[in-house]
């Protein structure tokens, strides 16, 4: 009801649809559906760029910045999303989360693509995965830095198993290249 009063024309919900005077979409996972809809409404901007997702307990920011610098040195126009904010040539914005909420993220990716970025390096936090902030993005490359028992507790993850689950979620749909005999 608050969303409709603020001007929303549709509501996503997980349970029986409330009578709010607007279109209601009942879905098992409203956050995931919001992310997928945001991607579609923004024209699926991630498809226009090489998307590189970086996850791990430590080293996401350093790794993301190094990857962006390597791509830039190769002549690529690169966007970067993470702990230090979001930036691409001529633009810089602060963020509230390492991995922004899906609607904000998709709008930022759209701006990057429209400004000619052909690659985006993105820190993908475990909470970003848990709350489906990156749902709807098909990463071309996934980077895993490491895993240690941090981010366990109220407001984050209940235990290490949950933390591991959300870290691994970045690689749920991936191909592994294993030509090395070792």
Regions from the language model: what does each represent?
Residues 1-36, 40:
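N-terminal leader/targeting and accessory segments in enzymes
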Residues 33-175:
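Phosphate-binding loop of NTP-binding sites
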Residues 177-182:
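Conserved small/polar residues in nucleotide/adenosyl-binding loops
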Residues 8, 21-22, 139, 174-176:
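Short, well-ordered alpha-helix to beta-strand connector turns
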């Amino acid at each position: 009801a608050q969303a409709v009063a603020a001007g929303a024309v549709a509501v996503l919900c997980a349970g029986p649809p409330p009578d709010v005077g607007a279109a209601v979409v009942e879905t098992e996972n409203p956050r995931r559906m919001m992310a997928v809809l945001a991607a579609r409404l923004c024209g699926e901007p991630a498809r226009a760029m090489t998307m590189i997702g970086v996850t791990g307990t430590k080293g996401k920011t350093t790794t993301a910045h190094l990857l962006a610098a390597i791509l830039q040195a190769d002549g690529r126009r690169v966007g970067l999303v993470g702990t230090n904010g979001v930036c691409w040539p001529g633009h810089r914005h602060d963020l509230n989360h390492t991995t922004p909420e899906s609607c904000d993220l998709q709008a930022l990716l759209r701006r990057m693509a429209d400004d000619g970025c052909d690659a985006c390096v993105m820190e993908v936090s475990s909470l970003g995965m848990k709350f489906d902030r990156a749902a709807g993005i098909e990463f071309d490359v996934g980077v895993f830095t490491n895993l240690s028992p941090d981010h366990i507790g109220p407001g984050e993850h209940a235990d290490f198993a949950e933390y591991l689950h959300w870290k691994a979620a970045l690689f749920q749909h991936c191909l592994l290249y294993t030509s090395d005999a070792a």
